[in-house]
Swiss-Prot record:
Protein name: Trigger factor
Task of the protein: Involved in protein export. Acts as a chaperone by maintaining the newly synthesized protein in an open conformation. Functions as a peptidyl-prolyl cis-trans isomerase.
GO cellular component: cytoplasm
Entry superkingdom: Bacteria
Species lineage: Bacteria, Pseudomonadati, Pseudomonadota, Alphaproteobacteria, Hyphomicrobiales
Family designation: Belongs to the FKBP-type PPIase family. Tig subfamily.
Organism from which the protein derives: Nitrobacter hamburgensis (strain DSM 10229 / NCIMB 13809 / X14)
Amino acid sequence: MQVNETLAEGLRHEFQISIPAAEITAKADARLVDLKDKVKLDGFRPGKVPVSHLKKMYGRSVMIETIEDTIRDTNMQIATDRGFKLAGNPKVTMPSEVKEIEDILAGKSDLSYSVAIEVVPAIELADFKTFSLEKPVVDVSDADVDEAIKRIADQNRSYSARAEGAKAENGDRVTISFKGTIDGELFEAGSSDDVLVVLGSNALIPGFEEQLVGIGAGETRVVKTSFPSNYMENDLAGKDAEFETKASLIEAPQDIKIDDEFAKLLGLEELDQLKQVVREQLSAEFARAMRQHLKRALLDRLDDTHKFDAPPSLVEEEFEQVWKTVTTEMETNKKTFADENTTEEAARVEYRQIADRRVRLSLVLSDIGEKNGIKVTDDEINRAVISRARQTPGREKEIWSYYQKNPQALAQVRAPLFENKVVDFILELATVTEKKVTREDLFKDHEAHSTEA
């Protein structure tokens, strides 16, 4: 076998390979001999089918399989011998002439082909003991618990009809029907009947609910307002509209006492138990946000300390996925790049940078895991699948079966488990200091970071 490197440019390498026809033929013949003991043909006893007969029947297909396997094995051997870590599947170019291909299949010509390989660069990992990271810390206060319970109470609040002739007040629930027009013309999704709205809840577009204060049952008003400039329906964003609105029922909120009886309505024994449950839920919510903030800071540090050229094919693949998501969301929301104060060209540059960052961080995390023996066990993956299955009661077996039959789906389960294990490994080595912040600051930062790569 002859292997000649014809290109070594950055992360791209190309080779010209030639494998003697005799070697390929010998491998194919060995397969036919092995096939002799497995195949069953009428007129022949098991294991007694002549190889020459098998060659007439299966010779071409066996030769094709042999060539495919030889090319795959040769490519992997080339990478192994040179210490290459492949960034993707090698790209093989076979002879273009039909006669050349037929001669190779007939064993008359050597197997000659070229292959292009893109490799992952060697990564020099930073000393994680030098990392200094800040973790925001927020304690769950009694006020947080009380506020959360009040929200629960508001969600479970009952309403009763006001007396005849009563006017709607802020906090009342009003049943309305409306027809919306823009420039005197009805518009799609601008009309609805029997809509329940609590005045002051800001459930409707700005300015709508305020104009319903003082309305009575059976009364009709024309509500004049404007759609926000960032409204999700681009066709309506920023436009003035009028809604002919009729109220059919005015209901006043009933007082609700937060006590042991209220807790029992929720299936708990007493108010203290409700407070404990809510505190635990808030603690878990805060912990997730704090963890995400710390993880983001760590990924930023890894990004800053590991600058290298990522394999272009991986960056392109990641960019295509990101771009597809972005453009699909824009089409769904009927947005344009101009609406986002940018151009398509500028957006492509921005999202390609995001794709490059993601690929580099993925390679860094993978390298850290490989060099430090970090693995995700089958048991950990199974527990994660079970957790996902339990989120859709009644379909647990179906979801379990789906993951067991789809290696790609299982890989998507494994990826975040592996990433979090590597993150934990680095955090054990880094210096992490805690900083007290307000709940508002924690979730403000958390929301901002959730929109970034």
